[in-house]
């Protein structure tokens, strides 16, 4: 392997949702409809919705599936099925706004360090927002942008990784995938012959091989010389 490129997941790898995309946003929208949600149930509701999302083995990007995903979180927090779709539409509008996401503090300095090492960089993401606009807003210096919305398949489908590799003009064995999802990012990339490193910011997976708790350790994990 000759390292030539690094592919990054986006959500919870490079950025986190800001206040406008938190459980409180669900609660505020529900309150306008006279519904009280239990924000303490957000994490469990989201985990359950993720499990249902994985029941679509064809791995097609389908906006109706993402809409249902948001509805299920709303219902899981105590919302009513009758108004779930309307509330989900309002919630999803916030996910399309680049300003509603905050970069982790380690992102820009680490991307700069990868550039100094003359590595090519891509972002590969599942989701419904305009990733080109997100990259431009946050001034991410990348060579390739691939999202499920434009590609048509979601990670861990091999073609979404392959699309990024083609744009970067590198072979799988010469690239590394960095992401926070074991199934979507790590297993998906390794199945294609790529090296993959889990970014585990909340330290949920201590037993995973090749794991970092922040991006500051990535250059060393890649064997890059530290700048002098």
Predicted region positions:
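Asp-based, Mg2+/Mn2+-dependent phosphohydrolase catalytic module
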Residues: 1-6, 16-17, 37-40, 82-86, ...
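N-terminal helical cap/lid subdomain that shapes the substrate entry/recognition surface
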Residues: 2-108, 116
